[in-house]
């Protein structure tokens, strides 16, 4: 997206903390978001929770961390936007749930939508990312197109991560 389009684009941020009341069911969460956000699609929400194997009668307070992450992604991706910002959506989630969440996100977004994911799980995102941006001490440390990095520099995003943040590109174990 060009910078002028980005200024006009509708942006959605998914925070690391859930904002659901303990009494809510998965269905209640959808209704709550539908009442507060006119860009929220209940149809898309139901598709997302189905993809993520959540049922509408599940209680929010009883969800595991992986299921809670799925619910947060479902409400975020059920909103219409040109730019989605996901803050650590895979943090603390087991491997199978991470795979399911990433698959659901990729199936849910339109090709003309921009998805920005902040994460320390670089290896998980490398296989689906077009570009990588690295911040260090609040400053842009590096940015690259993932495929160009592989072809031109014969490096992975993980290699570049290690160079920027330590270990000189060497694996520790």
Show the residue positions of the predicted features.
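ABC-family P-loop ATPase nucleotide-binding domains
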Residues: 15-71
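Catalytic Walker B motif of ABC-type/P-loop ATPase nucleotide-binding domains
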Residues: 84-88, 93
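Helical segment within the ABC ATPase nucleotide-binding domain
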Residues: 98-111
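H-loop/switch region of ABC-family ATPase nucleotide-binding domains
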Residues: 118-120
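A short, surface-exposed alpha-helical micro-motif characterized by mixed small hydrophobic
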Residues: 125-127
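ABC ATPase "signature
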Residues: 143-144
């Amino acid at each position: 997206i060009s910078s002028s389009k980005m200024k006009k684009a509708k942006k959605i941020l998914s925070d690391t903390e859930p904002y659901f009341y303990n009494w809510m069911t998965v269905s209640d969460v959808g209704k709550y978001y539908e009442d507060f956000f006119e860009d929220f699609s209940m149809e898309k929400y139901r598709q997302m929770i189905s993809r993520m194997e959540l049922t509408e009668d599940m209680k929010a307070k009883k969800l595991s961390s992986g299921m809670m992450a799925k619910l947060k992604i479902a409400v975020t991706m059920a909103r219409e936007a040109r730019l989605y910002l996901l803050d650590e959506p895979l943090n603390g989630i087991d491997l199978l749930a991470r795979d399911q969440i990433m698959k659901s996100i990729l199936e849910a977004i339109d090709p003309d939508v921009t998805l920005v994911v902040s994460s320390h799980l670089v290896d998980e995102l490398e296989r689906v990312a077009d570009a990588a941006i690295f911040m260090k001490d609040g400053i842009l440390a590096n940015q690259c197109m993932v495929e160009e990095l592989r072809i031109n520099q014969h490096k992975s995003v993980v290699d570049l991560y290690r160079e920027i943040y330590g270990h000189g590109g060497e694996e520790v174990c």
